[in-house]
């Protein structure tokens, strides 16, 4: 998805995508590759942006090329599994949303979890830009990503986001 976001940003800013050669560099190695001149630009993510400090310069927000707000992560299951396990699926969704609400309102505590689980420097964790986690999945927030995938041929045909979002029945949602 990172390359598609980059391509979309470049396209919106008038770049000729045929003149650009993309190379895969692991996220933790991007700042070094930039410093050594091995790449001209990189799509970096937090906490690596903050850790790089003034060694890198922001050219633009590739994710912003998709939409001002959109869904950037998701969890997927087959229709057959969801139909066979609707209660488990509903509990999973509730747990994810409950965690998102907690993380959005407990920045200090969630940063401490990042420090422990990702072995992140506490100073970096306190300074980095944090995402706001979605607390409900709305088709309007997923559609820009679906459209990007369609635009670049990842999907064989256009698709409506509301067709791929599972919603628990009211009885299962309350269980």
State where each predicted segment sits.
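Conserved C-terminal helix/tail region of periplasmic/extracytoplasmic solute-binding proteins
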Residues: 150-175
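Pocket-lining segment of extracytoplasmic ligand-binding domains
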Residues: 22-23, 27-113
């Amino acid at each position: 998805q990172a390359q598609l976001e980059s391509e979309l940003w470049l396209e919106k800013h008038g770049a000729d995508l045929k003149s650009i050669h993309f190379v895969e560099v692991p996220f933790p190695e991007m700042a070094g590759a930039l410093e050594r001149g091995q790449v001209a630009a990189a799509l970096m993510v937090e906490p690596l942006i903050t850790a790089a400090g003034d060694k890198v310069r922001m050219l633009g927000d590739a994710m912003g090329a998709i939409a001002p707000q959109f869904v950037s992560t998701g969890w997927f299951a087959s229709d057959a599994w969801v139909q066979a396990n609707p209660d488990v699926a509903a509990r999973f969704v509730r747990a994810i949303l409950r965690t998102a609400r907690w993380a959005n309102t407990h920045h200090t505590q969630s940063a401490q979890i990042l420090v422990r689980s990702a072995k992140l420097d506490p100073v970096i964790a306190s300074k980095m830009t944090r995402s706001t986690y979605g607390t409900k999945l709305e088709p309007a927030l997923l559609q820009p990503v679906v459209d990007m995938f369609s635009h670049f041929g990842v999907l064989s045909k256009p698709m409506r986001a509301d067709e791929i979002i599972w919603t628990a029945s009211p009885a299962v949602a309350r269980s």
